[in-house]
């Protein structure tokens, strides 16, 4: 049977026409009547002809040019609302930056939503962990992990102190120009692995970073593990962004990197499981993985949960410290005010680590951190999928004040980054770094659900106090040691004069944070 090119074109045209017709029929003759019956109204709807393919091209282009967050900013400007429909690759997505809708999805109607395709997309590296599971599996994970993040555990700063001082003494001192973003990632993986496993990767110390940990194919160094973890996360983020087509995204390097990560962590898991309980009780410091073995003896469960926590413990805190350094260099008057407050509260010397409560009481320090997290939330973009027919309280109708129908299977994205910079919510200086806005009353600044840097509702980040404590202590030590920070601004700036940001699972600066710390 011979098939010529014209036959293929005809067949393709028929297929596209069929899919277009199906999409239109579904929306106008199935979705709309059901919405009306439930007292809901339509939000703005944007079809990208044909089948949302042009929108896919724009998304891919934004991804490769590190313009993804600007793309979503533009998208909501196009909606001219805080909620709207967008056609992407033949699917209709609901996008929202409306605080009440996000509150409904994350809290009020939490049980109506799941993570959707995210489980399958992330399973290869993270397995059955708190960031991949929904429903009963997620509940079990949270119950297992919550006791491990009590204030007593996360406020012990002595173990962080060694690594923070290593960063300052070996890398920041001497007036060297460094990429602070890279070094903060090294710091946070060193502190996270010490908290989780009782032994650090020590990537900030060139000598100790070459220390090998036993694996099935020989020794794996902390440096090799850190590289494999970074490599695996890079492709993992592509799989998540690919949505329902996640299974098309894989490479041999991804699976090799996952294997290195699994083998590295298995060493600590089996070591903890083999430690007699009475000997473990004699240990003078808290180790996450040892405590977890008291709750379960399943090595796969322990490994998966440890990997999930490592993901949160490394990238989010590193991003917070990186963006904070950038702003403190760009706004020297803010750094001067912060340094003055730190020296007044903690002195010029690192005599002993401050307490958790002392860090929280340093108002200028906390204002700086809050403002950085407003402009650069840890997870700028997130997704959910409705597992039952439900609705948003607002966003529909000509004035955007009527409910919006969210049918079972509907995919939703919410852009925390866009919401926390929205002028309608935060005022005319919404994109300006201004920490003193947090001196105003909370009600005057925001309503509550328009500021969710660590997410919200039952899935709010368990490790947020760990991240805030580490970031706060690191900034205190920087202020104690250095009179100013010089930052070479990234060469690549967007059309809106905003720093280009590399959006993956979390967020980072495209050009790094090239800085010099002056004593």
From Swiss-Prot:
SUPFAM superfamilies the UniProt entry points to: Cytochrome P450
InterPro entries xrefs: Cyt_P450 (IPR001128), Cyt_P450_CS (IPR017972), Cyt_P450_E_CYP52_ascomycetes (IPR002974), Cyt_P450_E_CYP52_fungi (IPR047146), Cyt_P450_E_grp-II (IPR002402), Cyt_P450_sf (IPR036396)
Any one of the GO CC terms: membrane
Location relative to the cell: Membrane
Keywords noted in UniProt: Heme, Iron, Membrane, Metal-binding, Monooxygenase, Oxidoreductase, Transmembrane, Transmembrane helix
UniProt superkingdom: Eukaryota
Segments passing through the bilayer: 10-30
Cofactor: heme
Catalytic activity: an omega-methyl-long-chain fatty acid + reduced [NADPH--hemoprotein reductase] + O2 = an omega-hydroxy-long-chain fatty acid + oxidized [NADPH--hemoprotein reductase] + H2O + H(+); (9Z)-octadecenoate + reduced [NADPH--hemoprotein reductase] + O2 = 18-hydroxy-(9Z)-octadecenoate + oxidized [NADPH--hemoprotein reductase] + H2O + H(+); hexadecanoate + reduced [NADPH--hemoprotein reductase] + O2 = 16-hydroxyhexadecanoate + oxidized [NADPH--hemoprotein reductase] + H2O + H(+); (9Z)-hexadecenoate + reduced [NADPH--hemoprotein reductase] + O2 = (9Z)-16-hydroxyhexadec-9-enoate + oxidized [NADPH--hemoprotein reductase] + H2O + H(+)
Major subcellular site: membrane
Database matches in Gene3D superfamilies: Cytochrome P450 (1.10.630.10)
Induction notes from the record: Up-regulated when grown on alkanes as sole carbon source.
EC code(s) of this entry: 1.14.14.80
GO MF annotations, alphabetized: heme binding; iron ion binding; long-chain fatty acid omega-hydroxylase activity
Enzyme class name: oxidoreductase
Pfam entry (one): p450
Membrane topology, record value: Single-pass membrane protein
Binding site for heme: 461
Role: Catalyzes the terminal (at the omega-position) hydroxylation of a fatty acid. Probably involved in alkane metabolism. Has minor activity toward myristic acid, palmitic acid, palmitoleic acid and oleic acid.
Family assignment from sequence similarity: Belongs to the cytochrome P450 family.
Record-given protein name: Cytochrome P450 52-E3
Annotated source species: Starmerella bombicola
């Amino acid at each position: 049977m011979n098939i010529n090119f014209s036959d293929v074109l005809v067949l393709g045209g028929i297929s596209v026409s069929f899919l277009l017709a199906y999409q239109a029929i579904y929306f106008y003759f199935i979705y709309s009547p059901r919405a009306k019956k439930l007292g809901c109204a339509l939000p703005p709807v944007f079809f990208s002809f044909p089948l949302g393919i042009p929108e896919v091209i724009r998304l891919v282009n934004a991804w490769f040019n590190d313009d993804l967050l600007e793309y979503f900013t533009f998208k909501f400007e196009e909606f001219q609302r805080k909620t709207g429909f967008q056609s992407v690759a033949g699917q209709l997505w609901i996008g929202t930056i409306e605080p009440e809708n996000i509150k409904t999805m994350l809290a009020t109607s939490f049980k109506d939503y799941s993570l959707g395709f995210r489980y399958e997309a992330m399973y290869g590296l993270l397995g059955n962990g708190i960031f991949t599971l929904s429903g009963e599996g997620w509940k079990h994970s949270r119950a297992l992990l919550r006791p491990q993040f009590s204030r007593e555990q996360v406020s012990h700063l002595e173990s962080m102190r060694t690594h923070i001082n290593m960063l300052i003494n070996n890398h920041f001192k001497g007036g060297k120009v460094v990429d602070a973003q890279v070094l903060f990632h090294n710091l946070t993986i060193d502190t996270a692995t010490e908290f989780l496993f009782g032994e650090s990767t020590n990537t900030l110390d060139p000598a100790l970073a070459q220390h090998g940990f036993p694996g099935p194919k020989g020794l794996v160094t902390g440096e090799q593990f850190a590289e494999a973890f970074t490599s695996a996360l890079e492709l993992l983020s592509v799989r998540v962004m690919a949505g329902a087509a996640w299974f098309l995204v894989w490479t041999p390097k991804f699976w090799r990197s996952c294997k290195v990560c699994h083998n590295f962590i298995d060493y600590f898991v089996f070591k903890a499981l083999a430690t007699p309980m009475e000997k473990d009780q004699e240990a003078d410091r808290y180790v996450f993985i040892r405590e977890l073995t008291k709750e379960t003896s399943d090595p796969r469960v322990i490994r998966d949960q440890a990997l999930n926590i490592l993901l949160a413990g490394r990238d989010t805190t590193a991003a917070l410290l990186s963006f904070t350094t950038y702003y403190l260099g760009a706004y020297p008057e803010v750094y001067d005010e912060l340094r003055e407050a730190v020296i007044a509260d903690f002195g010029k010397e690192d005599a002993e680590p401050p307490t958790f409560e002392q860090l929280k009481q340093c108002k200028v320090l906390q204002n700086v951190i809050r403002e950085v997290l407003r402009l650069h939330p840890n997870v700028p973009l997130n997704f959910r999928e409705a597992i039952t027919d439900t609705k948003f309280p607002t966003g529909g109708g000509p004035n955007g004040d009527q409910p919006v129908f969210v049918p079972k299977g509907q995919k939703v994205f919410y852009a925390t980054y866009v919401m926390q910079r929205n002028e309608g919510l935060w005022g005319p200086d919404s994109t300006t770094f201004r920490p003193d806005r947090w001196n105003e009353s909370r009600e005057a600044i925001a309503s509550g659900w328009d500021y969710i840097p660590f997410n919200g509702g039952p899935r709010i980040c368990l490790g947020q106090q760990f991240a805030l404590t580490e970031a706060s202590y690191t900034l205190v030590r920087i202020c104690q040691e250095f009179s100013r920070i010089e930052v070479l601004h990234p060469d690549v700036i967007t059309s809106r004069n905003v720093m280009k940001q590399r959006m993956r699972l979390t967020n980072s600066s495209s050009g790094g944070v090239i800085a010099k710390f002056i004593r």
